Amino acid sequence: MSLSSGGWTPTPGFTPDQSAALPTHYGASQSQLGCQTVLMSVRVSVCHSGIRPLCLPGAGDESLRLQLSMDPGKSGEFRLSLQDSSGTGRSVTIAEFDLGTVNYEVKSPKCHELSLVAPPHDRISFNFRCEQEAQEWATVVLSSLREAQRVAPQDNGPQRPLDGLNLQNTMILQRTEETCIELTRAIEAGDMQAASAFAATLARQHATLKIQPSAGEYEDTEISLAVVVEDSSSSCCVTVKVFPHMTTAALKQQMFLEYGFHPRVQRWVIGQCLCTDQRSLASYGVHQDGDTAFLYLLSARHARLTLQVLQQDQESALLLSSPSLSLPTPPLPATSANGPSSLDQRPYTTLPPRLHTSSSTERRNISEIKDLINLEMPQLNEALSPNTASTQGWSCPSCTYINKPTRPGCEICSTNRPENYIIPGGYRPDQLELRRIQQEKEAIRQYQQAREEERRENFARLVMMDSQDLLPNPEPVDCRICYMDLQPGEGVLLRECLHCFCRECLRSVIMLSEEPEVSCPYRDDTYSCACSLQEREIRALVPAEEYERWLQRGLSVAESRCEGSYHCATPDCLGWCVYEDTVNVFHCPVCRKHNCLICKSIHEGMNCKQYQDDLAARAINDSAARRTTQLLKTLVQSGEAMHCPQCGIIVQKRDGCDWLRCTVCHTEICWVTRGPRWGPKGPGDTSGGCRCNVNNQKCHPKCQNCH
């Protein structure tokens, strides 16, 4: 007898000596390998917990082995046995279990536990020598256990003939499939009436269907999809080869195989849409090389993903993706709304259901399976290992994406190409790159053309605006003088400072100004505009008489401020000139008189000597002239009058502050210091003049606001 799952089963092949060495309540047998194929065998030490002792007299830990075998002629027939090879030279089966009715659990990296499903629920703990051997054993046993559990319901007994109910179900299924085929044909032909009838028939049957476009509707060309992978703390960019007809679920499975990201933690965003598993990539706009998708990774806790589930799914994915197994890849647990599924049951297909009886073929398939299982995550290691192949192109310093040599910026994050990168001399761009270069040249040409057109339009607009004497306000504003609301075009926009006022206010400012330069009237609590109105703006704002008066005021100020100026001696004449060393006579263009610049008078018909003699003679006999001269000298000597420091005429202060201005040269004078108020550069120049209020000091103790 030998221990099996759920009880004791007879096992032939014991010798009388071997049977005598075992307890009466425990049976041992020799392993029968004539019809069994051994998948894997490892050395273990055993710790048994149950109502029956599990031991063999004289057997040590070094002689115990766990052995997994299968029957090539029966699908899902796996046997797990505990062998002893001490002393006798032959392996003796201590215990043997049907793998389909036991539970196997990984307790720690070097400790596994087996328990019986049926009473008395014995438990056996196996301790392995190294972690790698324990991991390889767990991979094979767990995969075989799932295969045995999947096949078990199909092998409960011999198949019975179909009864009436099964026959009826078969007929219903046939009619449903035929209706689906007819519905497909009606939709392809565009027959709306027939399609509606077939759809109604299926709806009455409550048929469970899966409808999706045919693969022929998509382009069957493999493309490169740029994937930006991000989690809560980091991000990177990878390139994945995909087909447009692939679904999001297939893309998740591919990323799981290549990079180890479980489908439960994957969230895909393409074209600002959260992708669902059933839709294809083409439905989100993925059609050509370089299209971008974003993959956001959740935490395992948020996705309710355990380490055991991850390892099981990795083992299944690696086994199913191997070409040697030649089996279709079933999907991993379905996700709803791009999230984790609440179901833990998932289909598995690990080993081939039936192996050929030929010894050479059997040995080849077994070795292929063992080679596949002995590799520790081969696809993941290859996918995550750095690519050692030499690739032409430059690596982005920000996202590490490998770009084509001629690309000026990163295709993913638009970072500029490193300045020290040199395009290889013998590099030849491919067709896609040549098209991109041509598109860039065309884009640059169009940009330059649009920019030149914009410059021409701006220049034409500026020329048109410059031809206008007054610029109207382009938007509603308030006049800062009269506070009237000005609609677009009702006000005047000053060219120098872009301040806007109404026409009447600007006209009043010009007419009341005593200076030849009319300043902008804008004032507020913190700012005073220092710009001036242009001559053409003044000409367009005031009448012709006021404009002439403004021009004459400017000439008068220019004459008074000019050191070498001379005014025509004719009464009420506005003509004047500037002294020159070689010119002694000024021909006035206003009154047409000839002024002697030496005598500073008009003495036509007399030379300078004759005129001076005549003037001296008239001064002796003219008593009025003598009294006037004597009065002016007395005023100057008494301090009631003074000579202008610029032109020398006599000026007099009547009342008020100590500031006054010469009526001839318009020089600002400080009365208390008897000198100019400002320096040679005019108003604001404190390098000369009386320097009043410089360093908070008055120019004179008796100063009465000369500023």
From Swiss-Prot:
Q: Which residues are listed for Zn(2+) 5 binding in this entry?
A: C644, C647, C662, C665
Query: PANTHER family of this UniProt entry?
Result: RANBP-TYPE AND C3HC4-TYPE ZINC FINGER-CONTAINING PROTEIN 1, UBIQUITIN CONJUGATING ENZYME 7 INTERACTING PROTEIN-RELATED
The reaction(s) catalysed by this protein are: [E2 ubiquitin-conjugating enzyme]-S-ubiquitinyl-L-cysteine + [acceptor protein]-L-lysine = [E2 ubiquitin-conjugating enzyme]-L-cysteine + [acceptor protein]-N(6)-ubiquitinyl-L-lysine
Any one of the GO BP annotations? protein linear polyubiquitination
Q: Which residues does the entry assign to the active site, renumbered to this chain?
A: C657
| GO CC, one annotated term | LUBAC complex
Specify the residue ranges making up the RanBP2-type zinc fingers: 390-419
Q: What is this protein called?
A: RanBP-type and C3HC4-type zinc finger-containing protein 1
**Keyword Metal-binding found:** yes
Where are the annotated segments for TRIAD supradomain? Answer: 475-703
Ligand binding (Zn(2+) 2):
C497, H499, C520, C529
Record keywords: Oxidoreductase included? Answer: no
Coding gene?
rbck1
> Where on this chain are zinc fingers (IBR-type) annotated?
548-608
UniProt xrefs under Gene3D superfamilies:
Phosphatidylinositol 3-kinase Catalytic Subunit, Chain A, domain 1, Pleckstrin-homology domain (PH domain)/Phosphotyrosine-binding domain (PTB), Zinc/RING finger domain, C3HC4 (zinc finger), Zn-finger domain of Sec23/24
Q: What family, per the record? A: Belongs to the RBR family.
Q: Name one GO molecular function term.
A: ubiquitin binding
Enumerate the SMART domains for this protein.
ZnF_RBZ
Alphabetized UniProt keyword annotations: Metal-binding, Repeat, Transferase, Ubl conjugation pathway, Zinc, Zinc-finger
Give a short account of what the protein does: Component of the LUBAC complex which conjugates linear ('Met-1'-linked) polyubiquitin chains to substrates and plays a key role in NF-kappa-B activation and regulation of inflammation. LUBAC conjugates linear polyubiquitin to ikbkg and RIPK1 and is involved in activation of the canonical NF-kappa-B and the JNK signaling pathways. Linear ubiquitination mediated by the LUBAC complex interferes with TNF-induced cell death and thereby prevents inflammation.
Subunit details: Component of the LUBAC complex (linear ubiquitin chain assembly complex).
Superkingdom of the organism of origin: Eukaryota
Here the segments flagged for biased composition (Polar residues) are 338-348
Q: Which residues bind Zn(2+) 3?
A: C568, C573, C588, C591
Binding residue positions for Zn(2+) 1: C479, C482, C502, C505
